[in-house]
Amino acid sequence: MIPRTSTSLGWRLARAALLAAASVWLLSLILVLVWERMDSRRDAHAIVVLGAAQWDGRPSPVLRARIDHAIELWEQQLAPRFIVTGGRGPGDTTTEAAVAKRYAMSKGVPESAILTESEGRSTSESLRNVAQMLRSEQKDVILVSDPFHMLRLSILARRFGLKPRTSPTRTSPISKNRSEYFKYTMAESWKAPVAFFFEFSK
């Protein structure tokens, strides 16, 4: 028979663990909401556009919103480099980065200013590759993506030695769709702590 004191201790530990996990999640959610409202753009070495879906060689509305915002930053002459990211999805014939590059060029960004990162299959891989593309003394970047993405992007960018500023697009269709916005925000509130603790376990 298991002693009652052992059972009681087990329940207390389980309750404490659940409370700690809930506290971490709540703090993460608050930080996701805070970060999505921040726009810390300033002069940098590169503007980095995080990839999103492309449809048969055309940028999806989400990807287009990100590129359009990055072009606004480019036109403000905040950075000399314009980096587009994103690999090839299952069944795709081209990469998100290639589509983003063509679209940016069609809007006036010169090809000579654009760098493409087309190997990454995740946010983490893309940012790691971007860090490798930039010389050690040129790590200041402005990260462009959807608002809910900003906290985790900052965490991951720092892991790879980048010095990130964030500037979220305000025109993404995800932000205008309550159910989609809720879904992605909740997902980021779980992903951000994983990225944070993984960073500091290195």
Task: Name the predicted role of every residue range.
Residues 29-186:
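A structural signal for short, hydrophobic/glycine-enriched beta-strand patches
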Residues 1-45:
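N-terminal membrane-anchoring alpha-helices
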Residues 26, 177-202:
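A transmembrane-helix-recognition feature enriched in membrane-embedded lipid enzymes
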